[in-house]
From Swiss-Prot:
<keyword id="KW-0812">Transmembrane</keyword>
<protein>
    <recommendedName>
        <fullName>Uncharacterized membrane protein ArfB</fullName>
    </recommendedName>
</protein>
<feature type="transmembrane region" description="Helical">
    <location>
        <begin position="9"/>
        <end position="29"/>
    </location>
</feature>
<keyword id="KW-0472">Membrane</keyword>
<dbReference type="GO" id="GO:0005886">
    <property type="term" value="C:plasma membrane"/>
</dbReference>
<comment type="function">
    <text>Required for wild-type expression of ArfA and ammonia secretion, not however part of an ammonia transporter.</text>
</comment>
<dbReference type="GO" id="GO:0051701">
    <property type="term" value="P:biological process involved in interaction with host"/>
</dbReference>
<keyword id="KW-1003">Cell membrane</keyword>
<keyword id="KW-1133">Transmembrane helix</keyword>
<comment type="similarity">
    <text>Belongs to the ArfB membrane protein family.</text>
</comment>
Amino acid sequence: MDFVIQWSCYLLAFLGGSAVAWVVVTLSIKRASRDEGAAEAPSAAETGAQ
């Protein structure tokens, strides 16, 4: 029974670490996409606005 409890703890730790990694990667991709979109937006000088 000790093996099952230890294995369950390792499984929970793995799932928790995977969830944290997924959140970090998802947020960094969203932030990079948002920054990239802002960099590609034309400025007022490029659009001819005065």
